Every structure is written in structure tokens, then in C-alpha cells.
């Protein structure tokens, strides 16, 4: 085929994995009637997931060696022989189908061939951005292929004899409903649905914050046909950084922009100021509260202030402060003061009633 056709073809993915404490974190299997080995399951948080490996990917090369015609055990032996790191060239079902139609052989050199002519593109893309051509988001997407991929996907499928052909599940560590697996040759696979996709909308209705049963009911309510707006892991992270919920407007329209470091710092500074504002008044509030209290006490005492200043008689009535009276008189007044503070005597005629109530 021509070089131009190859240049426009979708590309495989090169996933570089470093073995963790529990291995690489993916399951390999072969399918009946299909040649090759496939990724069946990718464990969350594993080196395989971090490297971008997806369930349903077909394994083409291991450390630069083609394994398309090798048996399951031969491929496993190659991976184990790599010790603590391995390089896997894979293709997802959609890319695999398109490359087969174009007659392109999947190999690692295909990625290098695409990188070489594109080295001058970043500078041209920077100039285009500097020119401020904001009215052509699709052109900006073309100069940023990684951003062009970070779009939601609308998967339209009609129910087959065995249903749609996918399993739905929820993850305790992550909010939302996810595609656990997609059956080969199913309506779900034909629509482009992939394992680990997160469902955003069902038949145009947003499923954010919905429970598992709600999503299942919405799918069943569509009858024999359903439309699922989904995002893969990378796209989901991109929209979360932008603080935007994906929608059908993002299928072809302009994409949101993630917060830059400056904006994040501004947000952090605003949060810090807000925290400082919420925390700093606390001591001042204590002081103002005490001053308010003292003012209230003074205002209450201000009318009696005249009493407290005028009646030196009240101060002279204090047995301790009055030095003009005799000691016996002072003792008598002190005794009267103590007796006036005593609790009233109990009516013992009611003691039985009181105790019985207790």
C-alpha cells in the first residue's frame, strides 16, 4: 500500500511494563477461531493499567519479536523470560480491523515511521496556536493527536440473539459504572465498546451519580437498541482535570482545557486565603466576643454604675471593707450574709412524695 495510506492509518500501541510486587497485572488468553493471543483482564492500579494496556487488546509483539503465530505457552515463556520489564505491541479491536482492511502489517516500526515525519509538527502547531485560531478546534485537534483521542465515544448497538454482549460492573474504589468485559463478535464489540470504559450517558440521559440498578434499568428501557456514551480511562482522567462532565457535544465540538499550573496555584491560593479567612477570625472572634461581653456587662452595669460609684454605703456595708464598725458587728454581718445564701429549708412533710417520685 502507499505511504500516504499508511500515514493516515490508525496506529498500534507500545506498552512498556515494569513488573510490580504482584507481577504485571494482566491476563492473557487465546480465543477459539481467532489467531493470536489477547488481553483478557487488566487489574486496576497494576503496571499493565498504568502502561495503557486494555482488555480486548491483541498482542502482536513481545520485546520487538512478532508472536502472532506462536502458541499461548510460547508467548507466556517470552514474557517470563523478560525478567522485570517487558515491551508489548498491541492493537485494540477497532484499530486491528482497520489495519487489516488497509492491508497494513502491524509492527513496531510503524510507530517509528509515524514519529519521524511528525517532528516538525509541534513547532507549526505552536505557531497556529499563537495565531489564536480559536474558531477551528478540529484543526487544533489534528495538530494534537493525543488530544483528538481524548473524546467520549457514542456506541450504538442493537440487541442480538444473546443480548448486547457486555458485562456491567461497579468498582468500590472508583465512582461510576464500568464495562467489565465485551464478548467477541457481539453487538457491543461491533459498536466499539471496550472493557474498562465508563458509562456517562444511556440513550442521552446522564448517568453520573446513578446506582448500578439505575443504569441497568435505563439500558433495558431502550428496548432492542441502546446508545451508550462512554469514556476510556485516559479520557475520563482528562475531563476530570478539566472539571467538566463529558457529553455528546464533545464528540466533535471543542474540547475543554485542563487547569494549568498557574490556575491551580490561583485556586490553591484562593483556597488558602479562604481557609485563612475562615480560621483567622477565630481568635479575633474570641476577642470581639469577650469585648462584646464586657461591653454588655458595662452597659448593664452603667445604670448601676451610679449605684456602684454613688453608694459608698454599699461598700461600707461590707464587713471586711468597713473599718469603722466593731469586730462583733462585723462578725454578725458576716453571719447574716452566710445565712442569707443558704438554701431554703426543705418541707419534710413532702419527703415521702419526693422520694417516691425518684
Curated annotation (Swiss-Prot):
Keyword Chloroplast belongs to the record: no
Keywords assigned: Acetylation, Cell membrane, Cell projection, Cytoplasm, Membrane, Phosphoprotein, Repeat, Wnt signaling pathway
Highest rank taxon of the organism: Eukaryota
The PDZ domain, residue ranges: 14-94, 154-234
Region (Disordered): 114-192, 269-358
Biased composition (Basic and acidic residues): 135-149, 348-358
Single GO molecular function: protein-membrane adaptor activity
UniProt name for this protein: Na(+)/H(+) exchange regulatory cofactor NHE-RF1
Subunit structure comment from the entry: Homodimer, and heterodimer with NHERF2. Binds the N-termini of EZR, RDX and MSN. Binds the C-termini of PDGFRA, PDGFRB, ADRB2, NOS2 and CFTR. Binds ARHGAP17, EPI64, RACK1, OPRK1, GNAQ, CTNNB1 and PLCB3. Binds PDZK1. Interacts with CLCN3. Binds the C-terminus of PAG1. In resting T-cells, part of a PAG1-NHERF1-MSN complex which is disrupted upon TCR activation. Forms a complex with CFTR and SLC4A7. Forms a complex with SLC4A7 and ATP6V1B1. Interacts with TRPC4 (via the PDZ-binding domain). Directly interacts with HTR4.
InterPro entries for the chain: EBP50_C, NHER, NHERF-1/NHERF-2, PDZ, PDZ_sf
Amino acid at each position: 500500500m502507499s505511504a500516504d495510506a499508511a500515514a493516515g492509518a490508525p496506529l498500534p500501541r507500545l506498552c512498556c511494563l515494569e513488573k510490580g510486587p504482584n507481577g504485571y497485572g494482566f491476563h492473557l488468553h487465546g480465543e477459539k477461531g481467532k489467531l493470536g493471543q489477547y488481553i483478557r483482564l487488566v487489574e486496576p492500579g497494576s503496571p499493565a493499567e498504568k502502561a495503557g494496556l486494555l482488555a480486548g487488546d491483541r498482542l502482536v509483539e513481545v520485546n520487538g519479536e512478532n508472536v502472532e503465530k506462536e502458541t499461548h505457552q510460547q508467548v507466556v515463556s517470552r514474557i517470563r523470560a523478560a525478567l522485570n520489564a517487558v515491551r508489548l505491541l498491541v492493537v485494540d479491536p477497532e484499530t486491528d480491523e482497520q489495519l487489516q482492511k488497509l492491508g497494513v502489517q502491524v509492527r513496531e516500526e510503524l510507530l517509528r515511521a509515524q514519529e519521524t515525519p511528525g517532528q516538525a509538527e509541534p513547532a507549526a502547531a505552536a505557531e497556529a496556536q499563537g495565531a489564536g485560531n480559536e474558531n477551528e478546534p478540529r484543526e487544533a485537534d489534528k495538530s494534537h493527536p493525543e488530544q483528538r483521542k481524548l473524546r467520549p465515544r457514542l456506541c450504538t448497538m442493537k440487541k442480538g440473539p444473546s443480548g448486547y454482549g457486555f458485562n456491567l460492573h461497579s468498582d468500590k474504589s472508583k465512582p461510576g459504572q464500568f464495562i467489565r468485559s465485551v464478548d467477541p463478535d457481539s453487538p457491543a464489540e461491533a459498536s466499539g465498546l471496550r472493557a474498562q470504559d465508563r458509562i456517562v450517558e444511556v440513550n442521552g440521559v446522564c448517568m453520573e451519580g446513578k446506582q448500578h440498578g439505575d443504569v441497568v434499568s435505563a439500558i433495558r428501557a431502550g428496548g432492542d437498541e441502546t446508545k451508550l456514551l462512554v469514556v476510556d480511562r485516559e479520557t475520563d482522567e482528562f475531563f476530570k482535570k478539566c472539571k467538566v462532565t463529558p457529553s455528546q457535544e464533545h464528540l466533535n465540538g471543542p474540547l475543554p482545557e485542563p487547569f494549568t499550573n498557574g490556575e491551580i496555584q490561583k485556586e490553591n491560593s484562593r483556597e488558602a486565603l479562604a481557609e485563612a479567612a475562615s480560621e483567622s477570625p477565630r481568635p479575633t472572634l474570641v476577642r470581639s466576643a469577650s469585648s462584646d461581653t464586657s461591653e454588655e456587662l458595662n452597659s448593664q452595669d452603667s445604670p448601676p454604675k451610679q449605684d456602684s460609684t454613688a453608694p459608698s454605703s454599699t461598700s461600707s456595708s461590707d464587713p471586711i471593707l468597713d473599718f469603722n464598725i466593731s469586730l462583733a458587728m462585723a462578725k454578725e454581718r458576716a453571719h447574716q450574709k452566710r445565712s442569707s445564701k443558704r438554701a431554703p429549708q426543705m418541707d419534710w412533710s413532702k419527703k415521702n412524695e419526693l422520694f417516691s417520685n425518684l
